[in-house]
Amino acid sequence: MSQFSTEDEAELQTLLRKLLKSVKDRISGAPSVECAEEILLHLEETDKNFHNYEFVKYLREYVESSLGAVIEVETENFTKGEGHAVGSGQDTLVHAVTKNTRESTQYKQMMQTLKQTMMMVVESLINKFEEDQMKREEMDRKIQHQQSISQYADNCSDSDSSFNQSYAFIKHEQLQVIAEKLDPGRPREVRWEALQSLCHAPPSDVLSCESWTGLRRNLSTALTDPDPELSDKVLQFFAKTFSSSPLNVTKDIYASIGNTKTLEAHFLYHKLSFPSGTTSIDANRPDMARLLKQMRLMNDFQKEVTTFWIRHPEKYMEEIIENTLSLLALHSEQGMSSPGSEKSLEPIHLISLLDIKATWFKKWMHGYYSRTVVLRLLERKYKSLIVNALQQCIYYFDSCDALSEETLEMIHSLEHQQIGPAGRTLYTSKELEFVYFVHSLCVLGRLVMYTNGRKFFPIKVKKRRDPVTLTDLVVILINIMYQHPKPSCGETALADTMSPTNLVMEVLRTLCDRTECAVECLYQIPVIETLLAPLITLLTGKLPKLNSMESALTHTADTLARIATTERGLSLLLYDRNLVSAEGESISAAHLIVQFTQKLLAKELQVENSSSMSGAFIFVCRQMYNTCEGLQVLRPYSLHECIAQAWRTTSSMSERVPTPVPGAPPALASQELQSVVAWEEMLLDNLLNFAATPKGLLLLQQTGAINECVTYMFSRFTKKLQVSRCEKFGYGVMVTQVATTAPGIVALQSSGFVQTIVVELWSALECGREDVRVVHPKSTPMDPIDRSCLKSFLSLVNLLSSPHAVWELLGHRALPNKTEYNLREMATSVLDLMDRLIIINSDAKIHSLFNYEQSHTFGLRLLSVLCCNLDSFLLLESQYKLTDLLLQGQRDNVTEPPSGEGEFIIDGLSVERNHILVRICAVGGPSERKLPPRALQKGNDPYPWPMVSTYPLPKYYIFDVPKILRTKQESEIGAFLTSSKETERDASWMDDCRRQFCKIMATKSNTLTGYVLADLLEMVVLHLSSSSNDCFFPPAEYKVVDNSVKTRSLSSVEQLGVEISLRYGKFLKLLREDSEQDLCLLLKHCQEFLSQQRVKVTSELCGYPGHDWFASTVFLLMHGDVGRSLSLLLRFSRLLPSAFLWPPRLHSSVHLPIEIAQSAIHPIYSCTAHYVEMLLKAEVPLVFSAFRMSGFTPSQICVQWLGQCFWNYLDWPEICQYVTTCVIMGPDYQVYMCVSALRHLQQDILQHTQTQDLQVFLKEEPIQGFRVSNYLEYMEGLERSYRSMVLSDMRSILPRSS
């Protein structure tokens, strides 16, 4: 088959034609002939079907028949000479045979024959193609006269690309001829044929030819030709060119289409006047159809050009933008004349009709690259566009009352419009005015988003004496929203995206989401007054002028809620008292909103009360009361009770729905029942958000709905739903807040929340992912707590942070300690985790874990964090004997040498156990004890710290206490106290004492320790308790009789607390060896005294009082003198500071309102911690934000610090100064103390927020470097700003009758 016959050539021609048809799309997409050649040359590499083409199969058979014998001979010769080719020799064989074959005579003869034959085949194909092309052009000329001249959507859309048609490559000489034929002086038929040829040519060839400049000029002339066929053809060519040309060319084409002078002449020549009265414009009218096509092509280009113009010089973009703006600025002086005079139809009206929502402008303003050019040109040359847009909005606002009946109809028709023969063709003047208003509103809404855009304001417009400011514009928009007509029943389901209300709300939402925009545009008194005007009118008993009451009020509430989510907006609503209430008082917006909401819930307003509208206004209140400062303002209104009452009413309605009976009419329609359930959930959701703050959680608990609210939160949490549309974070903070209290943790347990967290942890820790195959095993964890378990670990830390949580979940619960554990048995409770992961005291527990070391390390890490809370540790130690278990674990973890004692095995578990043993045994602040690190060191001795296997601890972990020397300053305090004893103390003595105290604290605070400090504290308490004005609690009769209290017994928890206190006191050299009985006696007296002032708790939530750390602190402060300690505590119990410094003082106390006494929520949490969060947000916002992001709350760590009197967090001198400061300066200093400590830790807090271990850091690490004296001046500043609020609220803990 070395020669081709005539039949072979015909077959080759057919196969080649098929191949070219198969790759037609690839070739036609090539921008040049060279690129098309490259595509064909690399077809085998890029086309997976290459070897399936018949042409390729034919050539393969031809090569095999021509060279098969040669290849066999060469292969045989090579294998005889070299042996058999295997392995790496295979490549050598192939290369050698290929080389010899290509040098053979047969190969050269085959290639020559193939080339000659293919040249003849290709030439035949080209000739046949030219004949077919001539026939096609003739057919096109015949068909063209039969086509409709108004195929706008088909002919003008740039989606009808030239790449979708068949065309041949064209030579430059042919393009020169086409350019000459398009000369305006040529006959119409000649120009038509030239345009036909041009449309079939590749745009890349046309644009790269030398005659393009003249050709473009002739095309621009043809575009304005009266003959619609010619202009349509030019538009068709331009549309194809746009999609395949670089910007430097398309900008010229765009300039040709949007030629300002040409279009202006066109508008004036055809006298395109704006329709008036009953007249309308017809989109099918030839001149109008041409304009619409031209404008639409321009608009399509405007919307697409933003995707690529940044890759080109800025001057190209400037030309396009300036051409557009100059076109749209045509006729501006006639365009905004008075409505009664005749107006001209302008390009802005047509662009509004084609792009109603100004998508082109939004895209141009999106990127900084183009936005700067647009704003610069608008400011310098085309500000009239902005003025006209503003004027149109004002005109619509002034006339929207008259248009109200027609607006809905226009919206409905315009939303579903489709320009063309199949759609609408007639547009009235009102419709054109409306689309121009929508377009203008969208342009202005986008303009004011940006700083330089807002600089255009104020703007002077006609018929307004004063320029229109930004505030004026927003007020106008809100009033437009108010006047939008109420939709009829049949249209409520329509998503009327072009309704003025929705358009205005879109602008307002955008402004709310941008801080700078909101400050300049929304956070203004006139705007707030406009938003609240309907509320004030309704509260006065009148009806506001609103076309759709429910819609307008719901949108108002939505805007107010968005304003309330920001700090600046919330402050404006809470504190700016520029509004006049229904009673004529000047009040803030927050008071007005909550009054209106209460009236809505009570159904006392003249308005159709729908659940959606009520829910919207409750949501506004919620954005305020879920912050500490907002709750402070709204608390007097008892909104939580109003919402709870509405929830109870709704809940009873849904419960009363009877079981459906066949044949009986339903009591409630399914839709109505759904709305009742939705309203019930909405009320629960809003009630739940009271739990965002400590005081709010107390209010929620008092409603009796905390269990239902937590259950609802759990249902949303499991679905991973947001807290609200305005909330950036999930339910983490709220869960942590709830878990801090006894009723909260009980609600979390009963809802299933705790079980879900435990199961998730167990799945991540022990089960792994079920969908991972064995071929992709899980990586070996490098960290003690793997990243997959970190989230569950932090959730458990948050959950068990409070001793109340540990008590409710583990108190009086024995470990299962089974003899055998099923491998499939999952942990479902905290008790199970304690049994399976922490207290591993049998082989059965070890064998039940798939990842024993990793899981046990996790458990020990959790135990370490739990033991940081001394009360939690006492409970766990008293129930489970943790210390003995850990010591035994250390003793078991040694080698077994043939003789002598074994050595400790240093592994992850022994290091973790060692850390916990030191932590729970050594008591002290940052400079009083040393904790061993958890990480090993490099070198020969990776763990140089002593291992603990028996108590007492090695001295390595305990620092020596410095001796306290008497100094001049101490003598000064002593002299002051001595002089006070000798003279009668008057009312000014306390002021003198405070000044003297502050002076010593500022100069030499480290001398304010020892006996002098005890004397100072004792005298201050004596002085305050002797004054009826300073006594807060009524006097209580208590006879100190040692024999009667000695019969009382201390619980195991209290006994362990005594041991820790004695250990710390002896370490500080404050107590004698025989002080145990004295401390026990003091605690028994305190219990006896306080038990006489406690109510009988009917609730199961008695709370977990733990050890009395304040009494132990006083005992150490008085150097173990039980008489002085008891005397001071009894006098101190009458003072207000005792309520907050001495936690057992108000535990279930008769002095509290009965509902608070039975709630098990202590004032330290609901008052002190609440104000810590409030002040932290105002004074140290970065720290507050860090807590929010971590899911932890400042109240949790503060309750822990205060509950154990800063033991293990501060050194003993700082603890003494903390107590003395709060007694002398006032109980509100407890709040300032916590804020100061968190401010001191700011850098550490921010760093550990990044590493996602903030909770662990705050609980495990002491407050390094903190000195009360260094922050006393800062605390005095906080006192000046906040004392009136904080101290008054602390005083309000007693019932008003007291």
From Swiss-Prot:
Print the keywords alphabetically.
Answer: Cell projection, Cilium, Cytoplasm, Developmental protein
Per its UniProt entry, which superkingdom is the organism in? Eukaryota
Q: Which SUPFAM superfamilies does its entry note? A: Ypt/Rab-GAP domain of gyp1p
Q: What happens when the gene is disrupted?
A: Fish are viable during embryogenesis and early larval stages, but exhibit curvature of the body axis and hydrocephalus, and curled cilia in distal kidney tubules.
One of the GO BP terms on file: cilium assembly
Keyword Cytoplasm attributed: yes
Q: Which GO terms describe its cellular component?
A: cilium; cytoplasm
Where is the protein localized? Cytoplasm; Cell projection, Cilium
- Tell me where in this chain the Rab-GAP TBC domain is found: 1171-1283
Query: PANTHER family in the record, alphabetically?
Result: PROTEIN BROAD-MINDED (PTHR13465:SF3), UPF0183 PROTEIN (PTHR13465)
Q: What does this protein do?
A: Required for high-level Shh responses in the developing neural tube. Together with cdk20, controls the structure of the primary cilium by coordinating assembly of the ciliary membrane and axoneme, allowing gli2 to be properly activated in response to SHH signaling.
Q: How does it assemble?
A: Interacts with cdk20, which promotes cdk20 stability and function.
What name does this protein carry? Answer: Protein broad-minded
Species? Danio rerio
Name of the encoding gene: tbc1d32
